[in-house]
Amino acid sequence: MRKSKSTLPADAVPARRRFVQTAVVGGVGAALLPALAGARELAAAPPVSPEVRGFELDELTIADLQAGMTSGKFTAQSLTQKYVARIEEIDHRGPAVNSVIEVNPDALAIAQALDQERKAKGARGPLHGIPVLIKDNIDTADRMQTTAGSLALVGSRPAKDSFVAQKLREAGAVILGKTNLSEWANIRSSHSVSGWSGRGGLTRNPYALDRNPCGSSSGSGAATAANLCGLAVGTETDGSVVCPSSANGIAGIKPTLGLISRSGIIPIAHSQDTAGPMARTVRDAAILLNALAGADPRDSATTASAGKAAADYTRFLDPNGLRGARIGVARKYFGFSDSVDALMSTVMEEMKRQGAVLVDPADLETYGKFDDSEFLVLLYELKADLNAYLATRPDAAVHSLKDIIEFNERNREKEMPYFLQDIFIKAEAKDPLTSKEYLDALDANHRLSRAEGIDALMDKFHLDAIMAPTGSPAWLTDLINGDHSGGGSSNAAAVAGYPDITVPAGFIAGLPVGVSFFGRAWSEPALLKIAYGFEQATKARKPPKFLSGVETARVGTGL
């Protein structure tokens, strides 16, 4: 969950959503991260902007990496080794971005096997041999842990891969490691610090190290932006893919609920949870979406995708995707930042030049009406869904939300040094999912966000998509007061379970800002066409410089 002061109850705002071991496989050595045994110390940010040398793999796309493996310039092993070395160099040392909570100790062995398979049979597809990082709430049945950043799950390993991990392995990807996150996907406290977890410490924004990476997929966003992987996977309940994508200058896709299975993912709420691709380009995000989508008997929501999921999302990528597109401008998601509004005005003029038809304003009539019901549903589903998930982890030290609350109280110094667990406590007090209060709130969520919300707006103006700023530029990380972000447009698509794609739009004082395109259920093809057209017209992404802070003299807007 991502915090948004504009969209959730003021009394309980839900949050957004070293390593050196030498491994030698087939003569290839690399520093690999073993699982952390306990809490990571929160190191001070570097006092001055560190010098970060260029990296051979900086900004390389999946196509670039595959071309390198085809030509013999790279192998899966060499790519894995290079990314692991880079993680050691700038994630652990140097600017200490701290985005990777654990590197897969078997990554090089997996890469070696994939290289041998490529030689014998050819590549399985575009992800063959590509190192991918996944969020530390996604189960892997290997030597890595899955903890949601909590010390309560340290030492317990899942018995079975999540469907996401299974699909990545089937596609031939190298699961490089796990990324840090806002602990428990940022649903523990209304005063939380995005990007902080008891196990992983604080992830920093690579564009300005004193700024927040947003969350809860903080590490996936920061690591992708910092070129520590080919691709990453995040998860979202409300904002946790799109906000860290925006704050870290990358593309992120929050798909329609049911397009990607949630089985084996530590949950918040089954009515909103989903995994999603995070990448430096829209094309790479679409490639990853291809690999992750699919029906899973362990997640009944995926059966709804039958006949609705595309076989190949990359075929919808059109450099002229803005031409003729009718896009509604959701003005009620503006007004939280003058500089963001000015940047949006600039990019909207470019969209018009590219042939887009902007319907302005085009606001949801139900804007703000499902905030309270959303939070209520999350409280109910958190307790039920987390308890059900923990039943699959019999060797864990905790077996229920109540156990987690008690664990945190016993370990306050390490688990609650900056914020407490008021949302957990509220959730624990809730009744089963048969409660009328829950069922009424869930019905309100769906009605207000779907039929009377996004669907009604798109019907009224005959829209292909709705656009809004994804959020504000990255805020200063504040361990004392917690997050203080402003604005955010994720909630309607999140509550509806509809798709939402964010693309880099430009910079404010050197900090990236994204624009979101969202729409009806199963409209990923239309949204990808528009997002790709926007990306190709603006080319707004620029890699981070790992500065210690923003260059205030450059405050302004621009592509």
Model-derived features with residue positions:
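Structural helix-boundary/capping segments
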Residues: 170, 174, 225-331, 345-354, ...
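Short, surface-exposed loop/helix-turn segments at secondary-structure junctions
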Residues: 304-305, 439, 461, 470-491
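N-terminal twin-arginine translocation
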Residues: 12-21, 30-48
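Gly/Ser-rich catalytic/binding loops embedded in alpha/beta enzyme cores
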Residues: 29-32, 46-238, 256, 280, ...
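N-terminal secretory signal peptides
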Residues: 1-15
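Short helix-loop capping/hinge segments that flank enzyme active sites or metal/cofactor-binding pockets
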Residues: 128-148, 314-330, 380-450, 504-512
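Acyltransferase
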Residues: 80-81, 112, 162, 312, ...
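Flexible glycine/proline-enriched surface loops and loop-helix/loop-strand junctions
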Residues: 147-150, 204-208, 216, 266-274, ...
